[in-house]
Amino acid sequence: KNHPAAIYADKRVEEMYGVWKSGNGQSERSCVIAPDVQCDFTDLPFDDNSFALVVWDPPHLRHIGENAWLAKKYGRLDNNWPKMLHDGFKECMRVLKPDGVLIFKWAETQIPATEVWKAIGQRPLFGHHSGKKSQTFWGCFMKWKDTNDDAE
């Protein structure tokens, strides 16, 4: 998000600081959310066919308190998450150029990726699990020259 060729978009603009107990006593943590463009990923303020590459990392937590550190840092999903992810995926595809690539990051800690693919109406071309428990999934989608209307 800090690369000069990247445009970082998020609906939040926040600076958060906290203290928590760790093995050594107390440690501080901070999180600065400072997007280049403040917007909701279900309604992106970009023209159709604007980008050759989109990286999408939506919130992935449903069962977490509104004021929890992870909710503040990463956002949280509501009960309407399938529609939200469907609409966000559709928007990512809209702003992609034909033959553009969407890299999708999903943490399967609460919702399996298979449920996400059902919600968005497509499966990735390929993907890879990573992280300490292999719960983070990186998926690759492509916008074909004709259309991706099956994501409706």
Where are these regions (language model features)?
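Class I S-adenosyl-L-methionine-dependent methyltransferase catalytic core
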Residues: 1-152
